[in-house]
Amino acid sequence: MNVRIIKGDDGHDKIQVRLDLGVLQLEFNGRPDGERVGDHESWLEHYQARQREHDQAHPDGPPLMLESEDCLKLLREGVQYYHRYLSFWNLQRYELCARDTARNLKLFAFVREYARHDREKLQFDQWRPYVTMMHTRAVATPLAELRDFPAAIGAIDAGIESIRQFLIDYDQLHRAEECGELQQLIHWREETVARQTGVPKIGTSVKSVESLRAELDIAISEERFEDAARLRDEIRRISGGIAPGQM
């Protein structure tokens, strides 16, 4: 991902992302495109305020439901935050990546509760494991770098539990081994415990392949193709020349 920080015409820092079809420029704070929705920072805050007002006016009535056009606005806005938190991750601005991933997780929870149609709930919530993994990485990475391993492991455990809860919510816990985001956090936890104790993991070679495959899935989803190629080569080396079943 080709991303850098530049000074904008207003003197404030901006994120500049170079894409195949051009350059994307994002604000550091507020909505990434710099726009506002009336008196609110974002469509999410706008609909949250409307929901509170509705609840106060109709305390015993049904909640105000999000219609399809509302969800579309929230989805497009959520994609902006996705581009920004990936940019912050690549810039190693972990605290800002954690801020934006937490924001999108709140978005998913809001849509899950108030969207009228199940198809729109799933359209958002399908990304919960990925964003949870990214949030966990953003929180735990600087802690591990500071060698605060208990705090890092606690953050990883919280991420693992959140993804497991997602699988429980959809009656898919029996497929936990197929969830790349969950497996990556589990293996990262093992590696972090090994760093803390100085004791290598048992069965390192087998688990390394599983961990690398999970990383490969993430690299492809983030369009980090050079990293993906490197990971494929490493998997082939460890597996004795057998290529993984990805593209």
Predicted features by range, described:
Residues 63-78, 120-132, 196-208:
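TPR-adjacent "capping" and linker segments in tetratricopeptide-repeat scaffold/adaptor proteins
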Residues 84-88, 92, 133, 138-143, ...:
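Conserved small-residue packing positions in alpha-helical repeats and bundles
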Residues 97, 104, 111, 118, ...:
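Alpha-helical solenoid scaffolds that mediate protein-protein interactions
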